[in-house]
């Protein structure tokens, strides 16, 4: 199912989040190894400067059961000590059941799920 195609309305970031869109990542498919590399590089840069590394990464978006789960798991693999969070109230799956299944799978992989059930 094509979605979030560059230049389409679904690809645009809503005005309320524009200020956080400093470095959007265009990914060729649902999982972004580039995102993992960026997170690891940022973590290493912070540690070289004597600061704590990346401590928390929060994911929102669609589709919970495709893009969100893929990228949350990649982030956990690249930053195993960081807190990886998915805000379930800001996600949607292909179906409500696949959304819930993806949330359960992420929790089983030590990814925190916030606001689960708040929009069901």
Q: What spans do the regions from the language model cover?
A:
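Active-site-adjacent betaalpha module
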Residues: 1-120
């Amino acid at each position: 199912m094509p979605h979030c195609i560059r230049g389409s309305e679904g690809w645009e970031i809503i005005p309320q989040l524009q200020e956080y869109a400093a470095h959007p990542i265009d990914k060729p498919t649902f999982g972004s190894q580039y995102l993992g590399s960026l997170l690891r590089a940022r973590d290493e840069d912070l540690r070289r400067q004597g600061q704590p590394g990346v401590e928390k990464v929060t994911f929102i978006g669609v589709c919970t059961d495709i893009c969100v789960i893929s990228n949350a798991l990649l982030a956990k693999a690249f930053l195993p000590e960081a807190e990886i969070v998915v805000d379930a109230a800001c996600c949607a799956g292909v179906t409500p059941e696949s959304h819930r299944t993806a949330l359960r799978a992420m929790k089983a992989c030590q990814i925190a799920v916030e606001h689960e059930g708040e929009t069901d």
